[in-house]
């Protein structure tokens, strides 16, 4: 089918039958996109297990939205960037590695 391989932006619910968890994960991951996956389960252990296996930038479980301070971003062709939270600000930072810096030295104001 095409619908599970496309990145759809809209109120669309796609339900595809499966026999095993492994098959469900394979169907969900068999796409070049990976913005958000949704997991519905009465078993917290199963939901956690599935969330770890899914290839998406964000996973929402049992209708719970992402928390405040969470980033927004995907994987694969859905992009690698992160917006929001500490991960979003890191896009604008330029790290510098300094070897042998002595933090015990008190520097005079210039």
Language-model-detected regions and their locations in the chain:
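Conserved C-terminal structural/oligomerization subdomain of aldehyde/semialdehyde dehydrogenase
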Residues: 1-110
